Amino acid sequence: VTHYRITKDVHGESEVTKVDKDSLKNYSDDYHSTFIEVAKFAMLSNKDLGKKVNYIHFGNQCRFLLETHARSNYNIENVTDNAIKQIVSAYEVPESSESQVRRMLDTINSLSHGMSFNWDYVSQIPAKQIQQAARTLLWMLTNKDSQHVEAMTRNISGFMRICRTWQDDGLGV
């Protein structure tokens, strides 16, 4: 029996991919597939980043990842600025990187409501800022639990190596 996954890309086009046997063992498919999408978005070059038409939806995906992970592992219910102390403590974020984590939270939370009354503000957020938020999130998760991130991204060639270069340059850079 062969299994396939059908997803929509950022342009609204359907993508059909074969699902390998290891992926079928992962019971949290939404979390895993979202993790993969965010990781691929974080790895985009500046040239390819400019081609993303619907980059804003990655803010929601980042929030979904962080909320799911924080709630499941650290009983942190809301990943807002009010929970910054809990977040930096749970994820062992160095004090020097706290402001970058705060910017990441501000970015992903401002995008979590989609197109709404604040669309004028949201539409002004550049793709690079959202990508930096994604990189900060992925760095933070890697810093705390690199085995988790490696398991989630094992099919993305070079991800852990690239993620470590973000660490060397500072959070989300």
Label each PLM-derived region with a short phrase.
Residues 1-75, 81-95, 101, 105-109, ...:
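C-terminal lobe/lid and adjacent interdomain/linker elements of RecA-like ASCE P-loop ATPase modules
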Residues 95-147:
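Histidine-centered, metal-coordinating catalytic motifs and their short helical/loop contexts
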Residues 70-77, 119, 141, 145-152:
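Long, hydrophobic, amphipathic alpha-helical segments used as structural scaffolds
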